[in-house]
Amino acid sequence: MAKGGREKIKLQSTAGTGHFYTTDKNKKTTPEKMLIMKFDPKARKHVEYKEIKLK
């Protein structure tokens, strides 16, 4: 069987609301940490989300 190339990650809001998304990414093609703009429903606006490890 092939080794899984995708890693589960957590995207944490930088607005300080505690909101997060979970997703997965291909660790071979994108080894750097993700920084993406997404909607934070607690802040009610688009903010940056940083990748952190999923525990």
Curated annotation (Swiss-Prot):
It comes from Polaromonas naphthalenivorans (strain CJ2). HAMAP family: Ribosomal_bL33. GO terms for molecular function: structural constituent of ribosome. The gene is rpmG. InterPro entries: Ribosomal_bL33, Ribosomal_bL33_sf, Ribosomal_zn-bd. GO terms for cellular component: cytosolic large ribosomal subunit. Pfam families: Ribosomal_L33. The keyword 4Fe-4S does not apply. Residues 1-10 have a biased composition (Basic and acidic residues). Residues 1-27 are annotated as: Disordered. Keywords: Ribonucleoprotein, Ribosomal protein. Belongs to the bacterial ribosomal protein bL33 family. The keyword Ribosomal protein applies. This is Large ribosomal subunit protein bL33.
